[in-house]
Structure formats: C-alpha cells, structure tokens
UniProtKB/Swiss-Prot annotation:
InterPro entries: MS_channel (IPR001185), MSC/AndL (IPR037673), MscL_channel (IPR036019)
Record bears the keyword Transmembrane helix: yes
Keywords of the record: Cell membrane, Ion channel, Ion transport, Membrane, Transmembrane, Transmembrane helix, Transport
Localization terms from the record: Cell membrane
Protein name as catalogued: Large-conductance mechanosensitive channel
Record organism: Enterococcus faecalis (strain ATCC 700802 / V583)
Single annotated GO MF: mechanosensitive monoatomic ion channel activity
GO CC annotations, alphabetized: plasma membrane
Protein family (similarity comment): Belongs to the MscL family.
Quaternary structure and partners: Homopentamer.
Highest taxon listed in the record's lineage: Bacteria
Ranges annotated as spanning the membrane: 8-28, 74-94
NCBIfam families in alphabetical order: mscL
Amino acid sequence: MIKEFKEFIMRGSVLDLAVGVVIGSAFTAIVTQVVEGLITPLISLIFVLTTGKKSADDALGALVYKVEGVEFNIGSVISALITFLITAFVLFLIVKAANKMKNRGKKEEAAEEEVVPTSEDYLKEIRDLLAAQTPPAETVKTDSTFTEK
C-alpha cells in the first residue's frame, strides 16, 4: 500500500497540481493586495471626484446597505469579484501560454520524426531505382509456370 501511495504521489500530475495550488494561493494573495491597495482606492477616488463628496467613505457609503440592523457590504463583494476576475484572467493567460509551448514542442517532435527515414524506406528507394534502370523481362505463360523469353 505504501508503494502504491508513493507511486501515486510521484506521478507528474499530482506534483503539478500541488505546485499549482501553492502558486495559485500565493498569486491570489498578490492580486488581493493589488485590488485592495490600488484598484479599490482608485475606484474610491473616482467616486469622490464624480460625486463631489469630501471623502471616500461618504462617496462609497451607498455601497453598504443596512436593513433592520443587518449590514450588506456591497463594496466587499465588488472587491472580491474584481480579485476573482483578475486572478482568473491571469491564470487563463498562463494556461494559454503553457498550452502554446506544449503544442510547439509536439510540432517540433513531429517534424523530427518525419525527417528520419527508416532502413525500410532506403530499401524501397533502392528497389525503385533498380527497377527504373532495367527494363522488365517479357514473360510467357506455359501451363502452370511463367518462363522468361
């Protein structure tokens, strides 16, 4: 059982998945900080400039709704949505680039395979050249055998 588990863990796809999860987590943290540190303040600034409010809290106050003491923070949802979209888009670009490189490698392998002729190909070519140099002999049919004339 331990041997099977070791083979399972050492399989390339499991290791790739583990690396992807770790990198994805780290990347999500970076994107979250970019959204919270840059994009959200820019959106707040746009709200302040367009609405004429004195602070971002006043301008974004409409993004937090209170209904009977329950607070709905629409700004957090928008921030999470922006984070998700940026993360998904960057991961899409990474996967697209990886697939392109993978396909390029397959094309190069296919080109290499086509270039190398086999010994059977050489023998066929020799046979065809010899057949082209000597004219075919006439054959005459006698009872059950062919004889050359």
